[in-house]
C-alpha cells in the first residue's frame, strides 16, 4: 500500500508536509508478502472471508507523528473515579487502509464499566464461587475515526492485546482484530486484519429469533401494562417527553463453551471488547436518546450451572436463563451489583423453535427492560459481529420491533438497520432507523425504563477479593437453596458454621456454612466459619500545608541556576487515613541567568569532572559528558581515552540545561526537564518572535526566500549565503535528485558538512553557533536550523545529476531598528567578589557586573545592553599549601597491536602545586595515597591477523604512454584470524608512464567495412573523456577529385520556420531551450556534389586490414572519410537532414550541427561556448573500391529534437559509452569513386560563418563569435561564394581543445602549416580511490615546444575524484562475557577513510571484497571447573553481628565467577547485652542479721538503642545476686541502746508511720521511737515508755 500524505491532519503548509512526510510514513504498513496465521481457528475464519486487508497499526501523537508500535494503552494505576466531568486521556492510532490513512482519536470509555464492577467465576453453584473486583485495565476506548478525504466516523476499539473492535466509515462498517499468536518483535509492527461487516462468511443470512406478528407485539404490550399496574401501583407517570440520561446496568454471563473456546485467561478481555462496541452502538445519535450501557457484573461459568440449561432450542434456553438470572439478582436497586438486564453469551448453536442448529443468532423478550423475569436475552457468539447481535436484542428489550414489519422502516435499496430482522451484510454502516428511535422514545416516555434512572453507585469494598455474603444476605442465600419462599431461621445461633433456613415453617439445613461476609452480629461477619469483629476506624483527619521555607542558594553562578522553597504537609499532618495535601509542594525559580563565559566548561562537564578523583574500577579517568536524548536529565560521562560510558547520576544538578547547543532554555529540575520561556520563568509560554525578540510581535523581522534554479553544474556550486544572525533556516530540494547539499564557512577550504566529496550521515551537526539538522529521505535532502548563526555560512550543492530546483529561506532582524527600552533606566554594576577558585594554593577571585534597575536593584541581564557590559575583574587569592598528590601522564602507544605481549606505559610522579608551578617530590611523600598504575596490558585479546603474500609483477600492458601491471595477492592464513584488508598490498600498479616516441604519436585507425544495410552495425564503445570538445570534419578524398560535403542539418533546410517534417512526422522546435538552437554550417562550393541520402549509409565493423589509398593524402594510422557513388544508387542535390541523438549528459546540452552540400545559401550560425558534449568519430569503408579507404570518426552534435522515433529519417544514436553512428543507411556518390577531402577545423576567429535561412535566434544577451570555415589548400574549390576552411582554421580547432583523440588525427597539411599542440589519450586515474590524477601526452606538432609557445598549452594532467578509500576499522574486543563454558565478546566496526581515518557512511564500504569483520565472536569455550571451599572459621564476635570467613578458590582458574560461593557470612547477629547492677540498699537491720537489695537488669551494651532492651538475652552469663545478708552480729542488751526519743519531730514521724514507711531503714533509724524494732518485747516497750515519761517530768 502506498504511503499517502496526510494533508488533512492539520493545516500544514506544503513545506511542513514535505518535512514531516518521512515521519508520517514511518511504521505505516506491513512488509509485502503473505501473512501467516498461527492460530488455526482464526486462519480458517480469515481464509473464508471474500476480502480482507492486513494492516500494521501504529500509535501516534495528536499531530500524527509516529510514537510506537506498541498499541496497548498503558494505564497501570488504580482505576480512577469516573465522574462525568472528569478529565479524559486521549490516545491516537493510525492505520493505512485501502490506500488511505485512518486516524483514530480515542479516549477511555469512562462509563463503560461500573465502579463496582465484579468478575465472578462459578463452579456449579453459590457454594463454589469466586468473586473479585476485577482489575481489568482501562484499555477499552471509544471515539472517532477520520479518513483522508471523507468525514468523521465512529469507533469503538479495545487496546488490551492489540486493537480489537469496529469502526464506521461513510462507506461501511469495518472490524479489526490482531493476528493471534503472532510473534511480537520489539520495534516491529503487530499485523492486524481489517474486514467489512458484510464480508463475514455465512451460509445464510442470520436472523433474530423474535417472531414478527401484530398480535404478539400487542399482547406483549398488554402484558407489560398489566404488570406495571400490578407491581408498581404507586408510581405516577409523567406524560411529558423528557430526554435525560439512562444507565443500563448490565449482567453478562458466559457459558462453559465460551470459556472453552476463548480460554479462561482471555475470555474477560474478549467480552469487555464486545461490550465496548455495544456501548458505541448505543451512543450513535440515530437512537435519539442518551443511553449508556454499563457492565456491573460478569459471570464466567467454569462448570455447568445448576438450574441453568443451555440447549439448541432458543426459547427454552431463554426461559431457563431468565429464571436463573432473576434468582441471582439482588432485589434492591441500591445494591452495587444489581442489574437491569442480563445478557447470555454462548457458543451453542441456537435455533428458534427447534432443538437443532440453525441460523438464529439471538432471542429476547419484547419490552422486557426493567422486568426482573423478562429483562434478559441470549446471543450466539459469532466473533466481533456479536456486538451487533447484542445491540439488536437489547433493542427488543426497549420495545423496538423489527424494521419493515408492521412499520414504515423497510430498508430502502437493501440498506439495513440494526433492528432489521435479517442482518443483511450491506457495505453501508448500520444505524438505528427512525422507527427504532420512535419505539425506544415511546418506551422511555411511558416510564417503562424506570430502573435506568439511577447512576451506578460505587460500593465501599476495600478488599480486592469480595466475600459473597456481602452481596447475598442470609435470606437471599436461603432462597438460592430452597426457593423464593425460604427465609432464614432466626432462632438458630452460630450461623457461620451452619446455615439454617425456614421452609414451610420448618428449619432445614444442607449443613453448609453461611457464605463468607455474612453478617453475624453487630460489626461482625463470617470468615472461614468464624464470626469475626470488624473494627471501626477513627475519623480521618485531612492534612494541611505549612509555611514556605526561605529560598535556597542558587545552584549556579551563571547560565541560569535554580533556587527552591518547599513546604510540608504538617498543619496538621494527615491521620487515620486522611487525605494528603494536594497542590504545590516545592516551588522553583531561576537565578543568575546571565550567560557564562564562552571559554568556560559546560555545567555538565563540570559535573563529570567531579568524578575525576573518584576511582572507577580501581582506576582514575578524566571524564567528559555525553548526551542521552532519551534521558536528558541523567548524567552520563565517558573517559577521554575510553570507549565506554557510565551513568554517574540519576539526576543532574538543578539548572543543568536539558539540551546542549541550540536555543533551548529548558533546564533540568529535580530530574525533570522543565520548559523555560525567554523571560526566564519556569513553565512560561513566553517565546521569542521570528528574529529573537522576547515577547516580540515580529514587526522587526523579515523573511528572505530564494530559489536556486541552476540546472547543471560540476562539483560544488554555491547556492546562497546564510548571513550571521539568521534564524529559522530551511533549505530543501523541490524534488528528489542524486545531488547532495553541503555547508562551508566563508573560508573556502573549511567545510562543515559533506565536504571533500565525503557524504556524511543524517543527523544534527553543531556549526556556526546553532545545530543544523541534515536529513536525506531517498534522494530528497533538506537542511533545517533554528539559529541564530554566529557567522555567515555558504550553502552549496554537490552536483551529480540535473538540479530540479532548491528553495531556501531564513529570517533575520531588520537593520537600523532602535531599542525601545529606555537605556538610562538600566545600568551595569559590579557585584561582590566570589570565593577563591581553589581550596589550596593560589587561586582567583572574580567580580562580575550585574544589571541594575534604578531604584529597584538587580534584574535580569536581558534588560541591559550587552555591548556595554564591563569585563569581569579578577584578583589572586592565596590559600594554604596544597598537599602532595600523584600526577599521571598520558599512556604511551601500545607496544603491540595484537597478540599476548602488548603493554603500555605512562609516567606517574608525586607532585605538589606551588603557586603556578608544579614541584616534583619524592614518591614517599605520596605513599599514603593510592598510586595510579604505570603499566597496563593492552590489545592482548586481539588475535593477530594472518600475513599477506604477494606474487611477482606481470609485464606492463604497454611499453609507453601509461599502462597497468598486476600481481597476485593472497592471504597466507598462518593465524586463526583472517588477514587485515586495510593492509592488503596493491594488486595493480601503473607502469610504462614514459612518453612514446614521436613517430608513433598517430594511432593506427580501426578496421572496418561497409555493408549494404543488411546487417546492423555493432558499435565499438568509446570511453567518454572528462573534457568533451566538439570536432567537425568533412570527408576527404584524392586531390584530383572534385569534392562536396554532405549536409547534416535540421529537416527542411529551405524553410525558415521552426516547424518541419521528418519522414511524414511533424516536429517543432522548443523555444524554452535556446541553447539547442545554434548550428554549425560546413559546406564546399562544388556544383556537382555527391549526396548522403537517407537510404545509403551503413557501417559494419570488420576484421580486415585496411590500408590507405595511394592517391589520397593519407599515411599510416591516418583517418579518412569517403563518399562514393555508383550506378543504381539515387542521389540528390538538396541538403539532407541527419538527426543525431546527443551523448548522455546531465550537465549541459550542446548545439545542433549542420553540414550542407551544394551551392546553398550562406548561413550564419551563433557560436556555442559549451564544450561539454562528446563528439564521436567513426570509421567506414566503401565497398566496390579496390583501394581500401579508411574513415574518420565524425563529430556529431545533438539534433533539434532529442528523442526521435524509429520512423525518423535516421535512427537514434547510442548514448552511453557508445560511438554515435547511424545504422543501415548506405552512402554512395554519383560516380562511385571515393572522394577524400581534408579535415575541417573550427577556429574562434572573427570571420563570419554563413547563416542559413532556418537560423534559430541566439540567446539574448550574448554576442556570438562568427567562425569562418575554409577547406584546406589541397582541396579543389568551386566558384561558390561560400568560404572554405583554411589550415589556420584546423590548427585553431586543435589548439582550442576540440579534438577528441589527437592520435586519430591525420595532419592535413604537407608541413607548410603553423605549429599546434597534439594531445594523447587520458590515462587511467592514478589511484583506485581517493584523490588522483589523469595524465596525457602533450607535444607540439613540430616536436619543438618553442614553436607552440604562442599557443596556450593544453593541460597534461587533471585531478580525478573517485570514491573514498574506504575500509573497515575494528575496535578492541571487549572482555569475554564469561570466563568459561562459552561466552562472547564484541567490538565496534566502523567504515572509515583509510587515508585520513574519517568516519564514512556505511555504503562507502559496501564495495569492499568479502564480508565485514565480525562484530562478535565466541570465547572461553573450556568447561567450568568446580569451586573448592574450606570450612567456616569461628565467628569474629560473640554478639552484635560478627563475620565468619572461609577460603574459596578455583584450582585451575576456570571456574564460573558468576557462581562463586560466598567467602563471608554474618553470624551472632543477636544484640550484645550484659547484666547491669544497681547500688546496694541499706541493711534492713543494724544487728541480729539483716539483708540488702539491689536492682539487676539485662541491658544492651554500649552503642545499642535502649528501646532494643526487650530483645536482650543475658542467659549466656550467670545472673548477679539481687540480695545479700548484712549486720549478722548479735544485738547488745545494753539499756543505752534503747531509743527514748525520735530524732525527727514526733508529729512528722507519726505521719511517716501512718504512711507505712517504717519498713524503710532510714525512716526507722530517724524515727526509732515511733517505729520500734520488731524484736522489742512488750515489757521493753513498757519500760521505754516509762523512761520517756520520766524524761518529760524532768
From Swiss-Prot:
Expressed in skeletal muscle and fat. Induction: By IFN-alpha and by IL1B/interleukin-1 beta. Up-regulated in articular cartilage and synovium from arthritis patients. Up-regulared in chondrocytes. Disulfide bonds join 322-376, 351-358, 370-451, 409-435, 478-501, 489-507, 496-526, 520-531, 554-591, 558-596, 569-581. InterPro entries: ADAMTS/ADAMTS-like (IPR013273), ADAMTS_ADAMTS-like (IPR050439), ADAMTS_CR_2 (IPR041645), ADAMTS_CR_3 (IPR045371), ADAMTS_spacer1 (IPR010294), MetalloPept_cat_dom_sf (IPR024079), Peptidase_M12B (IPR001590), Peptidase_M12B_N (IPR002870). Residues 1-25 form the signal peptide. Residues 1002-1076, 1095-1174, 1249-1283 are annotated as: Disordered. Zn(2+) binds at residues 208, 392, 396, 402. GO terms for cellular component: extracellular matrix; extracellular region. Keywords: Cleavage on pair of basic residues, Disulfide bond, Extracellular matrix, Glycoprotein, Hydrolase, Metal-binding, Metalloprotease, Protease, Repeat, Secreted, Signal, Zinc, Zymogen. GO terms for biological process: cell migration; cell-matrix adhesion; cellular response to BMP stimulus; cellular response to interleukin-1; cellular response to tumor necrosis factor; chondrocyte differentiation; collagen fibril organization; extracellular matrix organization. Residues 542-597, 823-883, 887-943, 944-997, 1313-1366, 1368-1422, 1423-1471, 1472-1532 form the TSP type-1 domain. Residues 1067-1076, 1095-1114, 1273-1283 have a biased composition (Polar residues). Gene3D superfamilies: 2.60.120.830, 3.40.1620.60, Collagenase (Catalytic Domain), Thrombospondin type-1 (TSP1) repeat. It is found in: Secreted, Extracellular space, Extracellular matrix. Binds 1 zinc ion per subunit. Metalloprotease that may play a role in the degradation of COMP. Also cleaves alpha-2 macroglobulin and aggregan. Has anti-tumorigenic properties. The spacer domain and the TSP type-1 domains are important for a tight interaction with the extracellular matrix. The C-terminal four TSP1-like repeats are necessary and sufficient for binding COMP. This is A disintegrin and metalloproteinase with thrombospondin motifs 12. It comes from Homo sapiens.
Amino acid at each position: 500500500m502506498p504511503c499517502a500524505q496526510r494533508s488533512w491532519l492539520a493545516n500544514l503548509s506544503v513545506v511542513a508536509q514535505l518535512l514531516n512526510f518521512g515521519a508520517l510514513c514511518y511504521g505505516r504498513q506491513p512488509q509485502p508478502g503473505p501473512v501467516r496465521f498461527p492460530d488455526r481457528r482464526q486462519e480458517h475464519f480469515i481464509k473464508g472471508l471474500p476480502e480482507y486487508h492486513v494492516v500494521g497499526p501504529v500509535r501516534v501523537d495528536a499531530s500524527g507523528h509516529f510514537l510506537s508500535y506498541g498499541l496497548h494503552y498503558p494505564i497501570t494505576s488504580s482505576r480512577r473515579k469516573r465522574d462525568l466531568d472528569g478529565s479524559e486521556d486521549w490516545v491516537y492510532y493510525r492505520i493505512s487502509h485501502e490506500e488511505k490513512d485512518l486516524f483514530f482519536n480515542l479516549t477511555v470509555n469512562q462509563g463503560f464499566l461500573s465502579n463496582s464492577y465484579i468478575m465472578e467465576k462459578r463452579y456449579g453453584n453459590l457454594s463454589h464461587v469466586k468473586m473479585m473486583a476485577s482489575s481489568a485495565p482501562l484499555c477499552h476506548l471509544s471515539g472517532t475515526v477520520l479518513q483522508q478525504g471523507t468525514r468523521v466516523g465512529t469507533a469503538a476499539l479495545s487496546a488490551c492485546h492489540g486493537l480489537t473492535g469496529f469502526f464506521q466509515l461513510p462507506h461501511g462498517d469495518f472490524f479489526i482484530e490482531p493476528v493471534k499468536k503472532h510473534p511480537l518483535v520489539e520495534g516491529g509492527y503487530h499485523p492486524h486484519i481489517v474486514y467489512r461487516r458484510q464480508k463475514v462468511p455465512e451460509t445464510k443470512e442470520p436472523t433474530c429469533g423474535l417472531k414478527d406478528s401484530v398480535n404478539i407485539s400487542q399482547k406483549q404490550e398488554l402484558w407489560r401494562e398489566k404488570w406495571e399496574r400490578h407491581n408498581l401501583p404507586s408510581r405516577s407517570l409523567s406524560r411529558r417527553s423528557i430526554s435525560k440520561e439512562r444507565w443500563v446496568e448490565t449482567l453478562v454471563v458466559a457459558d462453559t463453551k465460551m470459556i472453552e473456546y476463548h480460554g479462561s485467561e482471555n475470555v474477560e478481555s474478549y467480552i469487555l471488547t464486545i461490550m465496548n462496541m455495544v456501548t458505541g452502538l448505543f451512543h450513535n445519535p440515530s437512537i435519539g436518546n442518551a443511553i449508556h450501557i454499563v457492565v456491573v457484573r460478569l459471570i464466567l461459568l467454569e462448570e455447568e450451572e445448576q438450574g441453568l440449561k443451555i440447549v439448541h432450542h432458543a426459547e427454552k434456553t431463554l426461559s431457563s436463563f431468565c429464571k436463573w438470572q432473576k434468582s441471582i439478582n439482588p432485589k434492591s436497586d441500591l445494591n452495587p451489583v444489581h442489574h437491569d438486564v442480563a445478557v447470555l453469551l454462548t457458543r451453542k448453536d441456537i435455533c428458534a423453535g427447534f432443538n437443532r442448529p440453525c441460523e438464529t443468532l439471538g432471542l429476547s423478550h419484547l419490552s422486557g427492560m426493567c422486568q426482573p423475569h423478562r429483562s434478559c436475552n441470549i446471543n450466539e457468539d459469532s466473533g466481533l459481529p456479536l456486538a451487533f447481535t447484542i445491540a439488536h436484542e437489547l433493542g427488543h428489550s426497549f420495545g423496538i420491533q423489527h424494521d419493515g414489519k408492521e412499520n414504515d422502516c423497510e430498508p430502502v435499496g437493501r440498506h439495513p438497520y440494526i433492528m432489521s430482522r435479517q442482518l443483511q451484510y450491506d457495505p453501508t454502516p448500520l444505524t438505528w432507523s427512525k422507527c427504532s428511535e420512535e419505539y425506544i422514545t415511546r418506551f422511555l416516555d411511558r416510564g417503562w425504563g424506570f430502573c435506568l434512572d439511577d447512576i451506578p453507585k460505587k460500593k465501599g469494598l476495600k478488599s480486592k477479593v469480595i466475600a459473597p455474603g456481602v452481596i447475598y444476605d442470609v435470606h437471599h442465600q436461603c432462597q438460592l437453596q430452597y426457593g423464593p419462599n425460604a427465609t432464614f431461621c432466626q432462632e438458630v445461633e452460630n450461623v457461620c458454621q451452619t446455615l439454617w433456613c425456614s421452609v414451610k415453617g420448618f428449619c432445614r439445613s444442607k449443613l453448609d456454612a453461611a457464605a463468607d461476609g455474612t453478617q453475624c452480629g453487630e460489626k461482625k461477619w463470617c470468615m472461614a466459619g468464624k464470626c469475626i469483629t470488624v473494627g471501626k476506624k477513627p475519623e480521618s483527619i485531612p492534612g494541611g500545608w505549612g509555611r514556605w521555607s526561605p529560598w535556597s542558594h542558587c545552584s549556579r553562578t551563571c547560565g541560569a541556576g535554580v533556587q527552591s522553597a518547599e513546604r510540608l504537609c504538617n498543619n496538621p499532618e494527615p491521620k487515620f487515613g486522611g487525605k494528603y495535601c494536594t497542590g504545590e509542594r516545592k516551588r522553583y525559580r531561576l537565578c543568575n541567568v546571565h550567560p557564562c563565559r564562552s571559554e568556560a566548561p559546560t555545567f555538565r562537564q563540570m559535573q563529570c569532572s567531579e568524578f575525576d578523583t573518584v576511582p572507577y574500577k580501581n582506576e582514575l579517568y578524566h571524564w567528559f559528558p555525553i548526551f542521552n536524548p532519551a534521558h536528558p536529565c541523567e548524567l552520563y560521562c565517558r573517559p577521554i581515552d575510553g570507549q565506554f560510558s557510565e551513568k554517574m547520576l540519576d539526576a543532574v544538578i538543578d539548572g543543568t540545561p536539558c539540551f546542549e547547543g541550540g536555543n533551548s532554555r529548558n533546564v533540568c529540575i529535580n530530574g525533570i526537564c522543565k520548559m523555560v520561556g525567554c523571560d526566564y520563568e519556569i513553565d512560561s509560554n513566553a517565546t521569542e518572535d521570528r528574529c529573537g525578540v522576547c515577547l516580540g510581535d515580529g514587526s522587526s523581522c523579515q523573511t528572505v526566500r530564494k530559489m536556486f534554479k541552476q540546472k547543471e553544474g560540476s562539483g560544488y556550486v554555491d547556492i546562497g549565503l546564510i548571513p550571521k544572525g539568521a534564524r529559522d533556516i530551511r533549505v530543501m530540494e523541490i524534488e528528489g535528485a542524486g545531488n547532495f547539499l553541503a555547508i562551508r564557512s566563508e573560508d573556502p577550504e573549511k567545510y562543515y558538512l559533506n565536504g571533500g566529496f565525503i557524504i556524511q550521515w543524517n543527523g544534527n551537526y553543531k556549526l556556526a553557533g546553532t545545530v543544523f539538522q541534515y536529513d536525506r529521505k531517498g534522494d530528497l535532502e533538506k537542511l533545517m536550523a533554528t539559529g541564530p548563526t554566529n557567522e555567515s555560512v555558504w550553502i552549496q550543492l554537490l552536483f551529480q545529476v540535473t538540479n530540479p530546483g532548491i528553495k531556501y529561506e531564513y529570517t533575520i532582524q531588520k537593520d537600523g531598528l532602535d531599542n525601545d527600552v529606555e537605556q538610562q533606566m538600566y545600568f551595569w554594576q559590579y557585584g561582590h567578589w566570589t570565593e577563591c577558585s581553589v581550596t589550596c594554593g593560589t587561586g582567583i577571585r572574580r567580580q562580575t557586573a550585574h544589571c541594575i534597575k534604578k531604584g529597584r536593584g538587580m534584574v535580569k541581564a536581558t534588560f541591559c545592553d550587552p555591548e556595554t557590559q564591563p569585563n569581569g575583574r579578577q584578583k589572586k587569592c592565596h590559600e594554604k599549601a596544597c598537599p602532595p598528590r600523584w600526577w599521571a601522564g598520558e599512556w604511551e602507544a601500545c607496544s603491540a597491536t595484537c597478540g599476548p605481549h602488548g603493554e603500555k606505559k605512562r609516567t606517574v610522579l608525586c607532585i605538589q602545586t606551588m603557586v603556578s608551578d608544579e614541584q616534583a617530590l619524592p614518591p614517599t611523600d605520596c605513599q599514603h595515597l593510592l598510586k595510579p598504575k604505570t603499566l597496563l596490558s593492552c590489545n592482548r585479546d586481539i588475535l593477530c591477523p594472518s600475513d599477506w603474500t604477494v606474487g611477482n609483477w606481470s609485464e606492463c600492458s604497454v611499453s609507453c604512454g601509461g599502462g597497468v601491471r598486476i600481481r597476485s595477492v593472497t592471504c597466507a592464513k598462518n593465524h586463526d584470524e583472517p588477514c587485515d584488508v586495510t593492509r592488503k598490498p596493491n594488486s595493480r600498479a601503473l607502469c610504462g608512464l614514459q612518453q612514446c616516441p614521436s613517430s608513433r604519436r598517430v594511432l593506427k585507425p580501426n578496421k572496418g567495412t561497409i555493408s549494404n544495410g543488411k546487417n546492423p552495425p555493432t558499435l565499438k564503445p568509446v570511453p567518454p573523456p572528462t573534457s568533451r570538445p566538439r570536432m567537425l570534419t568533412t570527408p576527404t578524398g584524392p586531390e584530383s577529385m572534385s569534392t562536396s560535403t554532405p549536409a547534416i542539418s535540421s529537416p527542411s533546410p529551405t524553410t525558415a520556420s521552426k516547424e518541419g517534417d521528418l519522414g511524414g512526422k511533424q516536429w517543432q522546435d522548443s523555444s524554452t531551450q535556446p541553447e539547442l538552437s545554434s548550428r554549425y554550417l560546413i559546406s564546399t562550393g562544388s556544383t556537382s556534389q555527391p549526396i548522403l541520402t537517407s537510404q545509403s549509409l551503413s557501417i559494419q565493423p570488420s576484421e580486415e586490414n585496411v590500408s590507405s589509398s595511394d592517391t589520397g593524402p593519407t599515411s599510416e594510422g591516418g583517418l579518412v572519410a569517403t563518399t562514393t557513388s555508383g550506378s543504381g544508387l539515387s542521389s540528390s542535390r538538396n541538403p539532407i537532414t541527419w538527426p543525431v541523438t546527443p551523448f548522455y549528459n546531465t550537465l549541459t546540452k550542446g548545439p545542433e550541427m549542420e553540414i550542407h552540400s551544394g551551392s546553398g545559401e550562406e548561413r550564419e550560425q551563433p557560436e556555442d561556448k559549451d564544450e561539454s558534449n562528446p563528439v564521436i568519430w567513426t570509421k567506414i569503408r566503401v565497398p566496390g573500391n579496390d583501394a581500401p579507404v579508411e574513415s574518420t570518426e565524425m563529430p556529431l552534435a545533438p539534433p533539434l529534437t532529442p528523442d526521435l522515433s524509429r520512423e525518423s529519417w535516421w535512427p537514434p544514436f547510442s548514448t552511453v559509452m557508445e560511438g554515435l553512428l547511424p545504422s543501415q543507411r548506405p552512402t554512395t556518390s554519383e560516380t562511385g569513386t571515393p572522394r577524400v577531402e581534408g579535415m575541417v577545423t573550427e577556429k574562434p576567429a572573427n570571420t563570419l560563418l554563413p547563416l542559413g535561412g532556418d537560423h534559430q535566434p541566439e540567446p539574448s544577451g550574448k554576442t556570438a563569435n562568427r567562425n569562418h570555415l575554409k577547406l584546406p589548400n589541397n582541396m579543389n574549390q568551386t566558384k561558390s561564394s561560400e568560404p572554405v576552411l583554411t589550415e589556420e582554421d584546423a590548427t585553431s580547432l586543435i589548439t582550442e581543445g576540440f579534438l577528441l583523440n589527437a592520435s586519430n588525427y591525420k595532419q592535413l597539411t604537407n608541413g607548410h602549416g603553423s605549429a599546434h599542440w597534439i594531445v594523447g589519450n587520458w590515462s587511467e586515474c592514478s589511484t583506485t580511490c581517493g584523490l588522483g590524477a589523469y595524465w596525457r601526452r602533450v607535444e607540439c606538432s613540430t616536436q619543438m615546444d618553442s614553436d607552440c609557445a604562442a599557443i596556450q598549452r593544453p593541460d597534461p594532467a587533471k585531478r580525478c575524484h573517485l570514491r573514498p578509500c574506504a575500509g573497515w576499522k575494528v575496535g578492541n574486543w571487549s572482555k569475554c562475557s564469561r570466563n568459561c563454558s562459552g561466552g562472547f565478546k564484541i567490538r565496534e566496526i566502523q567504515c572509515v577513510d583509510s587515508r585520513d581515518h574519517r568516519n564514512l557512511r556505511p555504503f562507502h564500504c559496501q564495495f569492499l571484497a568479502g564480508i565485514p569483520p565480525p562484530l562478535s565472536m565466541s570465547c572461553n569455550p573450556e568447561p567450568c571447573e568446580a569451586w573448592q571451599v574450606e570450612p567456616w572459621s569461628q565467628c569474629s564476635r560473640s554478639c552484635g553481628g560478627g563475620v565468619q570467613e572461609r577460603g574459596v578458590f578455583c584450582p585451575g582458574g576456570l571456574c564460573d565467577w558468576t557462581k562463586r560461593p560466598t567467602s563471608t557470612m554474618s553470624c551472632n547477629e543477636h544484640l550484645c547485652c550484659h547484666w547491669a547492677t544497681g547500688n546496694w540498699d541499706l541493711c534492713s537491720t543494724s544487728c541480729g542479721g539483716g539483708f540488702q537489695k539491689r536492682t539487676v537488669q539485662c541491658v544492651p551494651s554500649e552503642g545499642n538503642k535502649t528501646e532494643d532492651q526487650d530483645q536482650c538475652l543475658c542467659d549466656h552469663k550467670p545472673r548477679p545476686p539481687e540480695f545479700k545478708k548484712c549486720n549478722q552480729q548479735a544485738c547488745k542488751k545494753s539499756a543505752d541502746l534503747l531509743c527514748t526519743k525520735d530524732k525527727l519531730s514526733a508529729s512528722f514521724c507519726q505521719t511517716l508511720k501512718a504512711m507505712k514507711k517504717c519498713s524503710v531503714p532510714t525512716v526507722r533509724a530517724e524515727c526509732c521511737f515511733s517505729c520500734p524494732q520488731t524484736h522489742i518485747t512488750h515489757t521493753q516497750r513498757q519500760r521505754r515508755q516509762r523512761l520517756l515519761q520520766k524524761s518529760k517530768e524532768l
